[in-house]
């Protein structure tokens, strides 16, 4: 059983509200979950403290048990200081494909 900390969408049409939940990765996004850890309201201002609320003790407990945070939840945990998020860096993506091939061939010849 792979356990994930992720967002479950709630709210109405065009007015999203998300619960931060712990769920089995096989469960539907908005369906069954194991435990609710907090909420996220994207409609509030970014500097508003009530925009994101997490029970940090429960989050740390689930991370210690091996739960994997989703990308968005990992950003939240980085902001709150619970878990450092690894930076995604792919410098080759910005280089045009032809130049990438030429650089790879030049490196292979050396």
Swiss-Prot record:
Region annotated Disordered, chain positions: 87-110
Entry superkingdom: Bacteria
GO molecular function, one term: structural constituent of ribosome
Alphabetized UniProt keyword annotations: Ribonucleoprotein, Ribosomal protein
Entry-linked InterPro entries: Ribosomal_bS16 (IPR000307), Ribosomal_bS16_dom_sf (IPR023803)
An individual GO BP term: translation
SUPFAM superfamilies assigned to the protein according to its UniProt record, in alphabetical order: Ribosomal protein S16
Family (UniProt): Belongs to the bacterial ribosomal protein bS16 family.
Record flagged with keyword Endoplasmic reticulum: no
Ribosomal protein recorded as keyword: yes
Pfam families: Ribosomal_S16 (PF00886)
Lineage start: Bacteria, Pseudomonadati, Pseudomonadota, Alphaproteobacteria, Hyphomicrobiales
Protein name, as recorded: Small ribosomal subunit protein bS16
GO cellular component: cytoplasm; small ribosomal subunit
NCBIfam families: S16
Species whose genome carries this gene: Rhodopseudomonas palustris (strain HaA2)
